[in-house]
Amino acid sequence: NQFEGTKVDQNGSSRFHVDVAKLGLGDDLGRILNTQYEVFTVNGDTPNLIFDQRDYYSAEGYGTFSAALQDGLNQSLAPTTDGDPVIRVFPAWPKAWDAKYKLLAKDGFLVSSSIESEEIQYVEIESQLGETCRVRNPWDCSVVLYRNGVKAESIEAGENDLMEFETSENEVIVLVKEGTTPDQYRTSELTSVDYHTVNDTESNIIYT
């Protein structure tokens, strides 16, 4: 219906970028997002963000744009309709884009992560409800798990393997790949972005 409506009066909003993110196609997502963004800024002629092909733009377009960004950064979908949600960090993120984020996942998990030069640095998970946490391993090696700043266990897992562990309410879990520590990233900042991360001695990794 969206496609047909767009052909008739151009009053439609494509969800292609959201679908691409759900499918894990990061580089395609980057191209689609850039293309959609450029329709508002062609030659600088549309500073008020009016669509460059008409004098209006359907409001849902802005929502699908932000939804695609979030799905590219973090997903917590269940593999089946009656399954449990599984967290995936940077499941569909363009390889050339460095990024940091903090987003809420299902079952009350506040997830933070960072990627730079195509390398995911860590995964921090704040458990707000104390539920069982399920995460796909973003690395091609084993993972070290820290609980509230203390090294707790090593998880033998390969890339994209399912990792499952219990959490307590308000517990902070940090996952790093084998051979690294959370302290390496306590004050890390992306070299391609002009901002700073403030350190806090009461937590492994703090964002502002």
Could you tell me what each predicted segment is?
Residues S13-G26, G72:
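Alpha-helical support elements that line or immediately flank enzyme active sites
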Residues L25-T208:
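Non-catalytic C-terminal accessory modules of carbohydrate-active enzymes
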Residues N1-S13, F51-Y62:
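Solvent-exposed loop and edge beta-strand segments that line ligand/cofactor-binding
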